[in-house]
Regions:
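Residue-level marker for buried hydrophobic side chains located in beta-strands
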Residues: 43-45, 74, 98, 169-171, ...
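Short, hinge-like loop/turn segments at secondary-structure boundaries
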Residues: 114-119, 189, 232-234
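A structural micro-motif
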Residues: 68, 96-97, 145-147, 212
Length: 238
């Protein structure tokens, strides 16, 4: 494993008392992995790229955490820049549970492409590789991590945000984006299945969690995200 590449493009940030974020700057956008700590256990939210740099999650675990205390991966959705690190991570931790919304299964299993796309994802899995959100096993894992799942469709059918109540932080995945100076923006159009639905969902979620800090994958952290969204031109003109 060529760790130098991963070290050069990554930044480790503590974004709240119990959550760290690893940002991998690949030039065209930022790929993020969050690590939530509770009771000396660690839970990854998303896992990084598939083909270009498939060892992002493995790099994070090997270099910064005791792998025996890594207790699960919880996915925001199944696009390849979020799910791509799973195979390499599973070579390190073969029995690691992986949680995803059931509405993502047809796309991550290669049954069909995501809405608006012609090609299947560059990496596919078996349905049994995952624990579906809403099952007793996934509920237990979320409780252990101190997280609440929030279905947030639009970017993808089963896109899910995760709210950490103790830290009042909303892990948004690709709910929205920020630019490189932290200004809130719409989801990336070319990767979003239904932009109007995505914006409607984001507005609803941010209204409900208006006091929370928003952390997004392609970008950074935003305070007062609901107010920022409401006054933005991209939302007002949508």
């Amino acid at each position: 494993m060529n760790q130098l590449i991963y070290r050069l493009i990554s930044k480790r940030k503590r974004i709240s008392p119990h959550i760290e974020k690893f940002e991998f700057d690949i030039g065209i956008f930022i790929v993020s992995i969050w690590v939530v700590e509770k009771n000396n256990q660690y839970f990854l939210i998303d896992s990084g790229l598939a083909k270009l740099l498939p060892r992002m999650a493995e790099y994070v675990v090997r270099n910064f955490y005791d792998k025996e205390r890594v207790s699960g991966v919880i996915l925001t959705h199944g696009h390849s820049d979020h799910i791509g690190g799973i195979p390499r991570l599973k070579t390190l931790l073969p029995n690691l549970p992986i949680v995803i919304d059931s509405r993502e299964i047809p796309f991550v299993s290669g049954e069909k492409p995501y809405p608006g796309r012609e090609k299947l994802e560059p990496i596919t899995f078996k349905k049994q590789d995952f624990i579906e959100l809403g099952t007793p096993e996934s509920n237990e894992l979320l409780e252990q991590a101190g997280l609440k799942a929030i279905h947030s469709p639009g970017h993808s059918p089963g896109h899910t945000c995760y709210y950490h109540a103790e830290d009042n932080l909303l892990i948004g995945g690709d709910l929205l984006t920020t630019n490189r100076v932290g200004v809130l923006n719409a989801p990336m159009k070319e990767y979003t299945a239904d932009m109007l639905k995505a914006l409607e969902t984001a507005h609803s979620v941010l209204k409900e969690y208006s006091q929370a800090i928003l952390s997004v994958a392609p970008g950074g952290e935003v305070k007062n995200a609901f107010q920022e969204m409401e006054k933005s031109e991209w939302f007002q003109n949508s």
